């Protein structure tokens, strides 16, 4: 009890200090406890003022804009809106302990931002974003091997585009090759290269909860809420290899990921009386590769994925329900950036996601034409950065083809970031 009560007290005081105090904390403030435990506080404050021409679909209009809304949802005249968004703002609490079993030390992390329930309607409600948990996990590590249990990124969440506006929802997230999501699960991280080796190699393995939309009215009841991935009775499995090397003139990293999961297209319960009744589990799979290369002041990075029924991982332009999400397709993005000075840099981004519309019609003849059939995203960022402060002017454009025709939306944003 003596350890637990001070820990919670310090956590509360630290949260008030970081989020509402008059003075700025130093980067990654560390609080030490008497028993050797430490608490590291990190995060950032992020604010965006933006002008949209045309509407974005599904996620939102501000820091979570990703692809254009359908033609029928677009205004034909008076298309402009001016708004602000602070929901990217994030706080992270990481507790570290001394070794408890030989060289093995536990660590616990809780991270949250303000993209909670999307129900803040104007006036007033949209100025009161709600908290949500991003990460909540506990590690046990000896330095080279880490066992993680809790909610964290799936290994498919790999390379991330640079932006000052699109952070919690990265550039092209769910709209280009930028895929992956957070799930509760069991994660294993194992260093394969020797300590100090010029080329570092790491293996990641993950078994995560199944995921997908509810398949029946029974499964979608408020007290049930069981998706077709959970109803399969099987986890999602992923394996990833990371490679990295750094020299005085060149740094690079690369990774490759494999994914498999199952979805019960009839939900919980199954007809066992009909002749020939079979299991209704649908297999889903995917592969992904990404890389980052930095020769001097220049950066080039991106990733590519191909898979089937990966909507719960934000693939296939984030489509999960039509045809039970039985969609094949691929996506890719690339971004180039150059640091002209220690403070100024310019970044350019392009990405696309292309579901296989013909294969979908062949595999799902009664599902109708696939709603979102193709998406292209483009982004340009001029960034000024000095220490923990950064400000940027960003232009984002999305062109999305629906089964009802093409649509587009544009965003110009001024964003500021202060790293705690």
Residue map of PLM features:
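Outer membrane beta-barrel
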Residues: 29-63, 67, 72-213, 231-238, ...
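Outer-membrane beta-barrel "beta-signal"
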Residues: 384-386, 408-420
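Outer-membrane beta-barrel translocator domains and adjoining extracellular loop/strand segments
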Residues: 55-60, 119-129, 160-167, 213-229, ...
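Transmembrane beta-strand segments that form the barrel wall of outer-membrane beta-barrel proteins
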Residues: 105-116, 205-209, 256-262, 345-354, ...
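Bacterial N-terminal signal peptides that target proteins for export
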Residues: 1-12
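Detector for outer-membrane/organellar transmembrane beta-barrel domains
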Residues: 239, 244-372, 384
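C-terminal segment of classical bacterial N-terminal signal peptides
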Residues: 16-25
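Membrane-spanning beta-strands of outer-membrane beta-barrel proteins
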Residues: 86, 131, 181, 234-236, ...
């Amino acid at each position: 009890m003596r350890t637990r009560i001070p820990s919670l007290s310090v956590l509360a005081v630290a949260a008030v200090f970081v989020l509402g105090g008059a003075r700025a904390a130093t980067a990654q403030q560390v609080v030490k406890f008497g028993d050797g435990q430490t608490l590291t506080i990190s995060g950032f404050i992020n604010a965006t003022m933006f002008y949209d021409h045309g509407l974005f679909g599904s996620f939102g209009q501000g820091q979570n804009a990703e692809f254009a809304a359908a033609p029928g949802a677009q205004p034909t005249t008076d298309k402009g809106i001016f708004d602000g968004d602070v929901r990217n703002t994030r706080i992270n609490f990481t507790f570290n302990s001394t070794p408890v079993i030989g060289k093995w030390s536990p660590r616990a992390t809780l991270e949250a931002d303000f993209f909670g329930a999307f129900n803040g309607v104007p006036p007033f409600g949209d100025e009161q974003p709600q908290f949500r948990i991003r990460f909540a996990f506990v590690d046990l590590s000896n330095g080279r091997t880490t066992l993680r249990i809790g909610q964290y990124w799936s290994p498919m969440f790999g390379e991330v585009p640079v932006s000052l506006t699109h952070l919690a929802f990265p550039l092209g997230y769910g709209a280009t090759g930028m895929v992956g999501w957070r799930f509760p699960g069991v994660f294993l991280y194992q260093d394969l290269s020797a300590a100090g080796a010029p080329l570092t190699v790491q293996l990641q393995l993950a078994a995560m909860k199944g995921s997908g939309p509810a398949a029946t009215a029974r499964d979608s009841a408020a007290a049930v809420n069981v998706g077709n991935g959970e109803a399969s009775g099987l986890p999602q499995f992923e394996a990833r290899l990371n490679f990295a090397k750094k020299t005085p003139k060149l740094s690079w990293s690369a990774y490759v990921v494999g994914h498999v999961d199952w979805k019960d297209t009839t939900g919980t319960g199954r007809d066992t009386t009909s002749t020939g009744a079979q299991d209704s589990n649908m297999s889903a799979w995917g592969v992904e590769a990404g890389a980052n290369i930095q020769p001097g002041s220049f950066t080039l990075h991106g990733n590519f994925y191909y898979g089937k029924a990966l909507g719960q991982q934000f693939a296939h332009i984030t489509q999960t329900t039509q045809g039970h999400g039985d969609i094949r397709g691929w996506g890719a993005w690339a971004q180039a950036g150059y640091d002209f000075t220690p403070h100024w840099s310019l970044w350019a981004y392009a990405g696309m996601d292309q579901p296989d519309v013909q294969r979908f019609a062949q595999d799902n003849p009664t599902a109708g034409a696939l709603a979102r059939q193709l998406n292209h995203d483009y982004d340009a960022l001029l960034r000024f950065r000095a220490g923990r402060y950064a400000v940027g002017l960003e232009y984002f454009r999305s062109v999305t083809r629906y089964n009802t025709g093409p649509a587009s939306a544009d965003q110009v944003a001024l964003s500021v970031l202060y790293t705690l």
